[in-house]
């Protein structure tokens, strides 16, 4: 009898070994994940204290703007599987909404009136910056649904072409609705002169925090404002991903026909993807317009849409940390690193410029290299090599990593571990 009990216990232990090892692996991965998140959060918080130049903080704030944009596009492409090549249009709509309601452009003659959130006077309508954030997000979301409606029956390349058209139409319309426009309408957008005089966020004073966005010597308040907006966006997007809507997005991304047979409302699900993705673009537009104090419509070109797309693909579609990583890399590459690399190449080329014929010619070429002017080419090459060498991205979600990785024993082991953990 004792031998039977011992044998049964041994068989039970062998059966439970995969379970216990899987749970131990999950526990280790979660501990590593939270440690990494804590280290990144600490590094982000202390970053401005180690930057002596204001342009470095400005570069970080611009990178934060693109992080917001990439997070929004990730909803459309990474979660719902809808290719949107006109995403910069919603960026423009958010910035334009901020410019309309936060600059002297809409001057009125009504008597002066003030409230904690809105002030009316001869200089225009000025809505409090913090109230403008949800207003611009709602405006961009409405336009996202409006532009998404005609694409409901389109798939793949056809969807991409139509969204590309919308992305080109919006900035062109804004440029042509300025003073003296062909329609005879009043100046709505400022035209080629754009809109300027946009108000910055009001100074914050609470507890030991003093954030002056205008008169302060430091650009750090802008950086921390962007950090707060990113943190809020991540929380909202993670909640959406784990919700019923997020599962519906995953279903239509994998097989729209099967999703429809399971009772998922395809029209509603797709429109919500376009609308919510556009909302985060409008979110970023408010930050950009307030930081620069003006809106130039040439900023919202097709190149911007492609840049954001490259960020999402490089980092890993469907992966929040991957998208953030891709946005930071591409932003700094565009803002700082290409210029620094060009300067080093120019310096080396200057040393060989007066050499023998071939060396001198090559040195002259190096001395005049400007990588910043070849940004579209470089970004295209990055996109090409990413798709060829690492299609899942630098930091993919576990789901996409399994889809695109070869079926090796290592991958199968990760799949077994995934049974006991959440999606990243």
Give the location of each predicted region.
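Transmembrane alpha-helices and adjacent helix-loop boundaries
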Residues: 2-424
